[in-house]
UniProtKB/Swiss-Prot annotation:
Family from the record: Belongs to the Tom7 family.
This protein's record includes keyword Transport: yes
GO biological process, one term: protein transport
Domain of life of the organism encoding this protein: Eukaryota
Subcellular location: Mitochondrion outer membrane
Protein name from the UniProt record: Mitochondrial import receptor subunit TOM7-2
Role noted for this protein: Seems to act as a modulator of the dynamics of the mitochondrial protein transport machinery. Seems to promote the dissociation of subunits of the outer membrane translocase.
Membrane topology: Single-pass membrane protein
UniProt keyword annotations, A-Z: Membrane, Mitochondrion, Mitochondrion outer membrane, Protein transport, Transmembrane, Transport
Keyword Protein transport: yes
One Gene Ontology term, aspect cellular component: mitochondrial outer membrane
Residues annotated as signal peptide: none
Gene: TOM7-2
Quaternary assembly: Forms part of the preprotein translocase complex of the outer mitochondrial membrane (TOM complex).
Amino acid sequence: AKGKNTKKFAAVVDEEGGAVTAXYXF
């Protein structure tokens, strides 16, 4: 569950809440 999926998900979350991206910046 690490890699492209995580990066893509983080990008989507970044648009809604940049702070949340930090938690998904694996």
